[in-house]
């Protein structure tokens, strides 16, 4: 097995007609609409979970936390991320770095990015220097540009620990 493994994750959630905040990177961000989701709808943490699971060839977030399971209804995605990290550690993987890109026309993410990085680093038991989060728009194109939802991509590097 290779010592280094790379995974990519993607998630998207549509805005709902109700709510007054969204959760991204474990941070509550005021917004005129919430996100439609079975859990808390944290697209960043969901994409990161998928990237980590993919790098380890463990499947995807839906396999481990299915939206058909009522126990995950309204779930805090930070708990999901911590569970994924625990699975990785049990199999001898160490997180090298994580890079996430939030795609949203609104709300502005820049004021919240440092708090997101702190949360992710804490939940992954890594230095904040191993976590990068950035945000972009689609210049008003597509569903994110029309403010219909938020998407996120994430890439993760894992290192398999030698036995």
From Swiss-Prot:
Annotated site residue numbers, Transition state stabilizer: 38, 137
Listed InterPro entries: MECDP_synthase (IPR003526), MECDP_synthase_CS (IPR020555), MECDP_synthase_sf (IPR036571)
Annotated metabolic or biological route of this protein: Isoprenoid biosynthesis; isopentenyl diphosphate biosynthesis via DXP pathway; isopentenyl diphosphate from 1-deoxy-D-xylulose 5-phosphate: step 4/6
Lineage top rank: taxon: Bacteria
Binding-site residues for 4-CDP-2-C-methyl-D-erythritol 2-phosphate, renumbered to this chain: 11-13, 38-39, 60-62, 65-69, 104-110, 136-139, 146
GO biological process: isopentenyl diphosphate biosynthetic process, methylerythritol 4-phosphate pathway; terpenoid biosynthetic process
Function: Involved in the biosynthesis of isopentenyl diphosphate (IPP) and dimethylallyl diphosphate (DMAPP), two major building blocks of isoprenoid compounds. Catalyzes the conversion of 4-diphosphocytidyl-2-C-methyl-D-erythritol 2-phosphate (CDP-ME2P) to 2-C-methyl-D-erythritol 2,4-cyclodiphosphate (ME-CPP) with a corresponding release of cytidine 5-monophosphate (CMP).
Name this polypeptide is given: 2-C-methyl-D-erythritol 2,4-cyclodiphosphate synthase
Species assigned in the record: Hahella chejuensis (strain KCTC 2396)
Lineage of origin: Bacteria, Pseudomonadati, Pseudomonadota, Gammaproteobacteria, Oceanospirillales
